[in-house]
Curated annotation (Swiss-Prot):
UniProt-listed InterPro entries: 6Pfruct_kin, 6Phosfructo_kin, His_Pase_superF_clade-1, His_PPase_superfam, P-loop_NTPase, PG/BPGM_mutase_AS
Active site: D131, C161, H260, E329
Binding residues for ATP: 48-56, 170-175, 351-354, 395-399, 431
Catalytic activity, as annotated: beta-D-fructose 2,6-bisphosphate + H2O = beta-D-fructose 6-phosphate + phosphate; beta-D-fructose 6-phosphate + ATP = beta-D-fructose 2,6-bisphosphate + ADP + H(+)
Organism classification: Eukaryota, Metazoa, Chordata, Craniata, Vertebrata
Residue numbers bearing the Phosphothreonine modification: T471, T478
Record protein name field: 6-phosphofructo-2-kinase/fructose-2,6-bisphosphatase 2
Gene (name only): Pfkfb2
Species for this entry: Rattus norvegicus (Rat)
Positions of beta-D-fructose 2,6-bisphosphate binding: R259, N266, G272, Y340, R354, K358, Y369, Q395, R399
A molecular function GO annotation: kinase binding
Family listed: In the C-terminal section; belongs to the phosphoglycerate mutase family.
Reported function: Synthesis and degradation of fructose 2,6-bisphosphate.
Ranges of Polar residues composition bias in the record: 456-479
Length: 557
């Protein structure tokens, strides 16, 4: 019996049991914060005074959630306010006793929430980030009622900062260039914005974890990550949000991304494998060493994969480096160590399907870009925690990492240009990432394949609806990683692995490898069925002449 249904022992023999009042209150509280449905959309509500990094956190969190495949969108209340009030004059608009302005601000919030609802119901969004101050309990209660009416989950993120240096830096870096202050000098902007903050302080009611807000789900981030307070995390995605927010920081740093030096397989046009560096690849490694020495980067960490070409590149630097298996190149499965021409000849269906939707396509016995993103999530977390880092990796891995920092979607990610012997210098800034490309003037082959522009036949099964490869696997082991391309996406109709056999009727064409493999699979299946049917017939005859023993019962079952 659960603790919420415990009865008093003195009434246990009575026919009318009454639960303790304390247990009823505890049960009521549990229901008050539990979600309506496990998979309900989540509304993230930012809280905090101006210049506390709310928009920074909103955009960074949205970028991360979209990168891991959770559709997320920011709804910034300032954008709605500027639409309603075309010209901003002064901080007087934010005074709590300015009734007309208060009505406008509330109406803007309601319009934004309706857009949140439309995003969830019409655009299949999963998470919306409501980026506003939301400093009063009245405003937060209004948001909670809206969420309750629509069965949305709510998770609050409060940013608290009392460090004057951090606040001043935020104002100078972001607010001076705000659309609220066109053509104003810096001193006037600082003065007006500080007065705006004072207007909010008058009515600011922080989250109260001990009393008023103890049943809400939230995280308090204090002084840009010095301390955290987490309360009543409801589900998996909220725990992911908490984990991410506890890893990010705002200290200045630089991240360098580059591929290994040109390899022997690069020269041959082969993908995957574990070949060593070519002569030009070794020249790049020496040029990279010289570049790093000239930069004089403080406390630089160097990470590589566990493949030979990245290790050889790092060895030439003469510094300590760490090997990460999760930085290995995408697993091409049965296509490892093949050229694209060979893949097209041996596995034409696979080649066409990969061109159709490259992000979701999974190599037979290998990985997709979607798999690779999931594999690289710990790397992103560590990059967010660290200072200066150089990552020496591979083309597909580098694309995934760049897509995170540059906020690129699944359509763009597999086609990002990451040439050999080029360094990407990433410097996180207020609302994004500054990117510089550095060429070390060492020639290399071009391994990039542009996105195909040809139209695909309508009869071909889309990648996202295709559960399994038509291509036989390279080994007889049938226990393989399932090739489901999207969570919850099931085929519209059953997909037969023997579809290629239909082409044989009425046509004298040589069988492809796909057809041969499918024919062999059919032959084995028929033999197995014949054996099973024959076995059942023998058992039926024996059963008529003798009483079945335990052994035969077991066999028959």
């Amino acid at each position: 019996m659960s603790e919420n249904s415990t009865f008093s022992t003195e009434d246990s023999s009575s026919s009318s049991y009454k639960p303790h009042a304390s247990n009823l209150r505890r049960a009521g509280k549990k229901c008050s914060w539990a979600s309506y449905m496990t998979n309900s959309p989540t509304l993230i509500v930012m809280i905090g005074l101006p210049a506390r990094g709310k928009t920074y956190v909103s955009k960074k969190l949205t970028r991360y959630l979209n990168w891991i495949g959770v559709p997320t969108k920011v709804f910034n209340l300032g954008v709605y306010r500027r639409e309603a009030v075309k010209s901003y004059k002064s901080y007087d608009f934010f005074r709590h006793d300015n009734e007309e302005a208060m009505k406008i601000r509330k109406q803007c919030a309601l319009v934004a929430l309706e857009d949140v609802k439309a995003y969830f119901t019409e655009e299949s969004g999963q998470i919306a980030v409501f980026d506003a101050t939301n400093t009063t309990r009245e405003r937060r209660d209004m948001i909670l009622n809206f969420a309750k009416q629509n069965a949305f989950k709510v998770f609050f993120v409060e940013s608290v900062c009392d460090d004057p240096d951090v606040i001043a830096a935020n104002i100078l870096e972001v607010k001076v260039s705000s659309p609220d202050y066109p053509e104003r000098n810096r001193e006037n902007v600082m003065e007006d914005f500080l007065k705006r903050i004072e207007c909010y302080k008058v009515t600011y009611q922080p989250l109260d974890p001990d009393n008023y807000d103890k049943d809400l789900s939230f995280i308090k981030v204090m002084n840009v990550g010095q301390r955290f307070l987490v309360n009543r995390v409801q589900d998996y995605i909220q725990s992911k949000i908490v984990y991410y927010l506890m890893n990010i920081h705002v200290h200045p740093r630089t991240i360098y991304l580059c591929r290994h030096g040109e390899s022997e397989f690069n020269l041959l046009g082969k993908i995957g494998g574990d070949s060593g560096l070519s002569l030009r690849g070794k020249q790049f490694a020496q040029a990279l060493k010289k570049f790093l020495e000239e930069q004089e980067i403080q406390d630089l960490k160097v990470w590589t994969s566990q493949l030979k070409r990245t290790i050889q590149t790092a060895e030439s630097l003469g510094v300590t480096y760490e090997q990460w298996k999760i930085l290995n190149e995408i697993d091409a499965g049965v296509c490892e160590e093949m050229t694209y021409s060979e893949i097209e000849q041996r596995y034409p269906e696979e080649f066409a399907l990969r061109d159709q939707e490259k992000y979701l396509y999974r190599y037979p016995g290998g990985e997709s870009y979607q798999d690779l993103v999931q594999r690289l999530e710990p790397v992103i977390m560590e990059l967010e925690r660290q200072g200066n880092v150089l990552v020496i990796s591979h083309q597909a891995v580098m694309r995934c990492l760049l897509a995170y920092f540059l906020d690129k979607g699944a359509d763009e990610l597999p086609y990002l240009r990451c040439p050999l012997h080029i360094i990407f210098k990433l410097t996180p800034v207020a609302y994004g990432c500054k990117v510089e490309t550095i060429t070390l003037n060492v020639e290399a082959v071009d391994t990039h394949r542009d996105k195909p522009t040809h139209n695909f036949p309508k009869s071909q099964t889309p990648v996202r609806m295709r559960r399994n490869s038509f291509t036989p696997l390279s080994s007889s082991n049938t226990i393989r990683r399932p090739r489901n391309y999207s969570v919850g996406s099931r085929p519209l109709k059953p997909l037969s692995p023997l579809r290629a056999l239909d082409m044989q009727e009425g046509a004298d064409q040589p069988k492809t490898q796909v057809q041969q493999g499918s024919a062999q699979a059919t032959e084995h299946l028929q033999k197995a069925l014949e054996f099973a049917n024959g076995h059942r017939e023998v058992e039926n005859v024996l059963a008529k002449h003798r009483r079945p023993s335990m052994a035969s019962l077991t066999l028959l079952s």
